[in-house]
C-alpha cells in the first residue's frame, strides 16, 4: 500500500506567461520534492493501482524511467489505432464500460524517437535522472515529449509496465486535435 502525507502536498503556481508546454512541464517537475516524477495531464485519469505499480517499478534502483499501457477514450467512446501499424489491444473495463487497453510498444530507438509510437502515459522519471538529462526543454511549444523521451532512452534504463495505468481522454481541447497537430504530424 502506498500512502501520501497530505500535509506535504502543495501547489506552486506558475507566475509567468508562456505558450511552451516544455517550460510548464519543466517548472512543474523541478518544483516537485519527491523521488519519482509522474506526468499526468489535468484532464486524464490514473487507475486505482497506478501509484502502487509505479512504486513497485521504482523499487528496482536500476529503473530511471517507467511507462505503462493506456486506454484512450475519444469523445467518450473507445478508441483504437489501426493494428496494421503494430498496435495491439486488450479489452479493458473503465467506469463500468468496455474500453480498449492500448499495449505500449517495447522500449527501442524506434518507439522512443517517433512520437506516434512513443510511450503515451503514464510516464514517470526518477527525479535525479530527470534532472541529470536536463528535464523538459523549456523552448518547446510542441513535441516536448518526443524530445525528452529520446534523451530518456539514450541515457536511461527503461521499464515498460504491461498494465493499463492511465486513461487518456481525447477531446477538442487536446493538442492532438488543435491547430498545433498539423505541425506535430
How would you describe each model-predicted region?
Residues 1-15:
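Acidic donor-binding segment of Leloir-type glycosyltransferases
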Residues 37:
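Short aromatic/hydrophobic "clamp" motif used to bind/position activated sugar donors
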Residues 51-92:
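Conserved donor NDP-sugar-binding/catalytic core segment of glycosyltransferases
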Residues 69, 159-165:
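Catalytic beta-strand/loop signature of glycosyltransferases that borders the donor
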Residues 22, 90-124:
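A recurrent flexible, glycine/aromatic-enriched loop bordering the glycosyltransferase active site
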Residues 41-45, 69:
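The conserved acidic donor/metal-binding loop of glycosyltransferases
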Residues 14-32:
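Glycine-rich, basic loop-to-helix element that forms the pyrophosphate-binding segment
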Residues 141-148:
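Acidic donor-binding loop at a coil-to-helix junction in glycosyltransferase catalytic cores
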